[in-house]
Amino acid sequence: MTKKILIVDDEVHIKMLLEQTLEELEDEFDVELLTASDGEEGLAIIRNDHPDLVFLDIMMPKMNGYEVCRIVMEDEQYDGIKIILLTAKGQEVDRKQGLEMGAKMYMTKPFDPDEILKVSKDLLELEA
């Protein structure tokens, strides 16, 4: 079964780095990578494609990551979608807010590609 992973970030280089990192999962999973450049586009992809895992930046144009996370977590049709918040905001209050909204993890940029792979594998294997 194909695992869909959505990357939502307005920074092109971050999206590219995440894509390159997550392509390594193809050794263990049938993976389809999807990308969006802002919160509205990300939410539209979530509605249409129901990804298994979403890497979601917090500070983006049009709709921030907290708002996308809130909408997804409050709507039962999206049960099972796991969100990892990625941000340059490293303050404890920001992390706490994201986790309280239902995100599975809160990671700060710059991120460790090995940690991204481990967390992704763990969350995708929970579904299997």
PLM region spans:
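Two-component/phosphorelay signaling modules centered on CheY-like receiver
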Residues: 12-34
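Alpha4 helix (beta4-alpha4-beta5 surface) of REC/receiver domains from two-component response regulators
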Residues: 67, 90-105, 117-121
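A Lys-centered signature of the CheY-like receiver
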Residues: 109
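Helix N-cap/capping motif at the beta->alpha junctions
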Residues: 35-44, 65
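Receiver (REC) domain active-site loop signature in two-component systems and cognate sites
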Residues: 60
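Active-site beta3 strand of CheY-like receiver
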Residues: 49-55
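Short amphipathic alpha-helix used as the core "switch/output" element in two-component signaling
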Residues: 44, 66-79
